[in-house]
Structure formats: C-alpha cells, structure tokens
C-alpha cells in the first residue's frame, strides 16, 4: 500500500517529524487532486465548470478533511483516482491523440490507485462499461489490454503479501461486512454516512 509513502515523503524519511509534516503529504495530495478536478471539468466543458467541480470537491468533508488531512490510504488513492479520471476524459475528448504512451500511463495511474486501496480497480470496471456501451470498437485496441496488464503488475505486491499472510485483509473485511439476509440497518447507516461525509449540501446539489 502507498499509505506509508506520503508521511515518509513529507517527513523526509522521518528526519522532520511534527504534526504538520506527518499530515503534509495528505494535504499536498488533496491540493493536487483539487487541481486535477479543475482541469478535468475544464477539459470536458469550460473553466467555469472546472471551477465549480473543484469547489464541490473541496466542500466534501471526505475529500477535504478525511482524505485531505488525516493519514489514510484514501489520500494517495484520491490523487491517482482523480488523475486516472482526467486521463480517461482526455481519451473521451481527444481519442485520436491518445497514443500507446497514454494507455500505459493510464494503466500506471490506475495501478497506483489500486496499490493505495484495491477499490482502484473499479476504475477499469467503469471505463470498461463506458467502452462497452459507447465505444465498443476500442475493445479491439491492443494497447487497452496492455494498460490493464500494467495495472495488474501493480496488484502483484498486494497478492504476494496476502498469500503470505493467509489473505487476512479480505478475511477481516469479510467478517466485518458480510452478513446473511438483508440488513436494513447497515443499508441506512451506509446512506447516512455518505450523506454526512460528502457534506449534505454537496450531496443534495449533486
């Protein structure tokens, strides 16, 4: 996981240890993510749309405080997650300019997002769904599959560690979230959590 990389980077390998330095990596990652969201909105529509997107992103309690201030794996994940979406948007807007280097770059970005938290693989699921319904001819593009293989290379350390530790990561989360039958209380808790984490005003406006 890249969870430890940000504090190691921001503290100069623990040569500068303070409350600020420990959180600085997450703060910088959140700042860059906000800029990427602005660039994505600008690319898709206009600078004004980019500004509004960046404002909504910053107003989210999750992106600005939880992932943007606390020392969590979400901090590097959001950086590479938003960067991957920007790269995908570039392909949607200007597919003719998307060469093999761009495809490999996308594979690396999604790989880094996945190395932060395995949820990063959903980026390929979402992008694959878009291609299937809107750009099915791209599924014949060989560099698409090379990019997926690049991402899988980033997943190998996760698999290696879990193989050596009896897949404890997934066993822990399975015991925590998997229950038999419909859990109305858990469903309500999830929806309420999303509502509060994203900032009620942002949740409603979006």
Annotated model-derived regions:
Residues 20, 24-44, 83-87:
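Transmembrane-helix motifs of polytopic, lipid-linked glycan transferases
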Residues 112, 124-206:
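Transmembrane-lumen/periplasm boundary regions of multi-pass, lipid-linked membrane glycan transferases
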Residues 24-32, 59, 75-83, 124-125:
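Membrane-embedded alpha-helical segments of multi-pass membrane proteins
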Residues 53-59, 110, 114, 128:
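Short helix- or helix-capping micro-motifs
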Residues 68-76:
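Short acidic/glycine- and proline-prone juxtamembrane loop motifs at membrane-interface regions
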Residues 90-111, 141-145, 149:
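Short hydrophobic alpha-helices at membrane interfaces in multi-pass membrane enzymes
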Residues 36, 56, 76-94, 105-110:
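Specific aromatic-rich, kink-prone transmembrane helix
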Residues 5-7, 12-32, 70:
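Loop-to-helix entry region of an early transmembrane alpha helix in multi-pass inner-membrane enzymes
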